[in-house]
Amino acid sequence: MLAVKQHGFGGREQLSTCELPRPTPKEGFVLVRVAAVSIHAGDHHMLTGRPYITRLVGLNEIPGMDFSGVVEEIGPGVANFAAGDEVFGTTDTAGGAFAEYVSAPAKNIVRKPATVSWEEAACLPTSGMTALQALRLGSPVRSGQRVLINGASSGVGTFAVQLAKSMGAHVTGVCSTQNVEMVRSLGADVVVDYRTESVEAAAKADSESYDKIIDLAGRYGWRQLLMPRGSLVAVALPESECIPCVLCSIVCSPCCCCCLSQQKSHALMQAVTPADMEELAGMVTDGNLRVVLGLQLSGINEVPDALAGHSETTGQGHRKGKTVISFAAKPETMTRG
């Protein structure tokens, strides 16, 4: 099979496209012929090996996590899928998705609704689940609460804006100039262009603080913007070469103050949850969630440049929606329902 191979940690120079043996699904796994893949921040960290703590996972020969496709073969002990099923899911940190075939744990995939495209489905697993779980972590968002999303134009951010609105929240999105209108189109009540206005100034203009802040960029100190009982969910990992520093950023609150404070902070460790993926796909089917497809490419040979380019723009904070690659060689069944 044709696959993307990663030779080491770094940039584009560590990626190539070559022929590799097609995997055989082991017990509890499913072999999927890939229709589309998406790229997210985790792929960036696994390519660059930064922060260094990500290197503890090890180097995956084939990178990539999130995919959609058709079940080709099931491994021993798999009873809930059969050859021909249209599915989407993730390999999580095990990688392997950037190939014509991927072997993934059956517990990490769900059926794709006919009305959800291959490209949309491939974008849902990690980014969609991260957004949903961030909004539910600690004290779940309730109707009427004020939520700020830093990094609102990113893959996770575009989901988070819409999901927070669906929960009845008043949403402020923070993004760069070129993405302001897009974030507003997703339903954000207030959009702050961090290039021209500080978030602090925008909050003062509103004369309000926030019940929950979702930080997808890791660039501000948020304590002064939280309500007395507000909470911060930190999703972004700092690009630090110091493993203790990264661990401290996870364990220690970016907004922690004295022990008397009732403000809470959480470092999100996203968990693969099939029920969340099914919920997200259902919202897309019902027209209540839009997958923002930013860069759309076709063919596995596009993956190395797309992954390297995603890493560059992620570091610069300029993400716009999801990067998705459709694979040219699709089974005849791979048409949108």
Feature names for model-found ranges:
Residues P21-S38, R50-A94, L216:
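Glycine-rich beta-strand-centered segment in the early N-terminal region that forms part
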Residues H45, M65, E73, N80, ...:
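NAD(P)H dinucleotide-binding glycine-rich loop of Rossmann-like/cofactor-binding domains
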Residues G84, A99, G144, A188, ...:
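Local beta-strand N-terminus motif with an aromatic residue
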Residues E86, R146, G230-L232:
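Short glycine-centered segments of the SAM/dcSAM-binding site in methyltransferase folds
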Residues A97-A99, S176-M182, M277:
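Short, glycine/polar-rich helix-capping loops at beta-to-alpha or helix-loop-helix junctions
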Residues A122-T196:
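Mid-domain Rossmann-like dinucleotide-binding core that forms the NAD(H)/NADP(H) cofactor-binding site
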Residues T172, V190-S265, T333:
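Glycine-rich cofactor phosphate-binding loops and adjacent beta1-alpha1 units
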Residues A271-G337:
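C-terminal hydrophobic helical "lid"/dimerization subdomain
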